[in-house]
Amino acid sequence: MDAGTIISLFILGSVLVTCSILLSSFSSRLGIPILVIFLAIGMLAGVDGVGGIPFDNYPFAYLISNLALAVILLDGGMRTQASSFKVALGPALSLATVGVLITSGLTGMAAAWLFHLDIMEGLLIGAIVGSTDAAAVFSLLGGKGLNERVSSTLEIESGSNDPMAVFLTITLISMIQEHQTALSWLFLVHIIQQFGLGILIGLGGGWLLLKTINRIPLPSGLYPLLALSGGIMVFSVTTALDGSGILAVYLCGFVLGNKPIRNRYGIQQTFDGLAWLAQIGMFLVLGLLVTPSHLLPIAIPALLLSLWMIFVARPLSIFTGLLPFRGFTLRERVFISWVGLRGAVPIILAVFPMMAGLPRANLFFDVAFFVVLVSLLFQGTTLGWAAKKAKVVVPEVGRPQSRVGLDIHPENPWEQFVYQLSADKWCVGAALRDLHMPKETRIAALFRENQLMHPTGSTRLREGDVLCVIGRERDLPALGKLFSQSPPVALDQRFFGDFILEADAKFSDVAFIYGLDDQSAVDQNRTIGEVVLALIGAAPVVGDQVDFAGMTWTVAEKENNQIRRIGLKVAEDSDE
């Protein structure tokens, strides 16, 4: 490869990435998932598109996709809170194992019938498309305001269900090559090995990387690179030992994100940009890899297979996998069934048969790509609508315009939050002394018309003021309400109820004041928080609702899996 060719590749790559970034701004306006835009640009640049670029280097695509997945999952793990694991670890692992087996089996049997394949080849297609995709889930769920139980279950499921799909794919390829039709007992051993090594090396490698980052003094710009290289090393070593590298790198990121770590905010900001670059690069390459003209002959059976998986296989797997977990409402189960987002992982798994030289490998790849397109276009575009219909959305708390960590020490939790006040903010016109600031927070600076003010307690806030507030992450909900817009309060009342009560209030007192219906089944000395928690039957999340004693009780605030505040409204008005 000469210098001219290398420069041409640089130009081509930069043009494609730039176009992807610029066109991504249209995704929200058009209601199209941003990943579809990245994929479409790759297809347009490919052999059947305007670019006409011939690309069929499957090993290179496999390399780029795995590297990108490692970066995306490392970033996703860092952003997963430990509280999410307490709420959703059991259900997510059930869906990542039993759920994938059921989805793959049902989809595989349908594929064998639709494409006139033998049962083993059909099951291979089912295994390829059987798992949800972490990149798609993290990208499309962000900013939707889902309750914690639903969002955590979907995110942890997407980060942990790939080992089962990868193992099923590799096992079925081997069985097809050796003309086997029955599984051996080694199947179970290999599954345990995949999950076991992924968990062990992921947690152990994350802990070792954390200690290294906190112990060694480096220029601030090198900490993100050390975290990135360490995460990729965990991914690579686990994969080389026949474990799940995808699960390992996700858990490695989880350890880094939930323990005190030096230069946390610099690492997170760098990872955010790298994760976007990884998604763009991965979907561009996968878009280049497909030949759209090959999708037309299989369009009808592939569409039927997609609909079967969306409306039959996925819901059956979800309802079966969540049977032991009574904390999920019917609406939550239906919504989780709908969010079976497929993305890069099925396409990457479809490369395995190509590299193994299976006779119908091209068909497997084209079917997987078609299923991914249908999933992103159909399920991805209706995600917001489905969440509202299922009532799994909770009112969003106002967020700061920006936040910067005060990296004085790894154990230091303090941050600076920046809020800009628009006309619809409640606090506009209020004096600083009248603001009910959360304990241990301070207004560090006030800017007005680009000038630094020297405020006093009598200074009144105006539209356009910029406030710099020192606080901690736990203060964000209270600060968000303080600096939130006026309209959402009406939404809060409609969602949580007209009355927000402290969870430590005695149930007997509340029953007397509000004249509740028959409550003989309840210990009158218990608090309303204890009563609601018992009725939920699982770790509570904001937005949990139970109907009891003629009222709807809604968890309005919680801390460390303990209910702090509860909304109350008449049950007959709950669906308005």
Swiss-Prot record:
Signal peptide range in chain numbering: none
Cellular component aspect of the GO annotation: plasma membrane
Reactions that this protein is recorded to catalyse: K(+)(in) + H(+)(out) = K(+)(out) + H(+)(in)
Keyword Transcription: no
Transmembrane parts of this sequence: 3-23, 30-50, 58-78, 87-107, 109-129, 185-205, 221-241, 280-300, 303-323, 334-354, 363-383
One record GO biological process: cell volume homeostasis
Protein's cellular compartments: Cell inner membrane
PROSITE patterns named among the record's database cross-references: RCK_C
Keyword set, alphabetical order: Antiport, Cell inner membrane, Cell membrane, Ion transport, Membrane, Potassium, Potassium transport, Transmembrane, Transmembrane helix, Transport
Gene Ontology terms, MF aspect: flavin adenine dinucleotide binding; potassium:proton antiporter activity
Domain RCK C-terminal: residue ranges: 403-485
Membrane topology: Multi-pass membrane protein
Family: Belongs to the monovalent cation:proton antiporter 1 (CPA1) transporter (TC 2.A.36) family. NhaP2 subfamily.
HAMAP family membership: NhaP2 (MF_01075)
Its biological purpose: K(+)/H(+) antiporter that extrudes potassium in exchange for external protons and maintains the internal concentration of potassium under toxic levels.
Listed name of the protein: K(+)/H(+) antiporter NhaP2
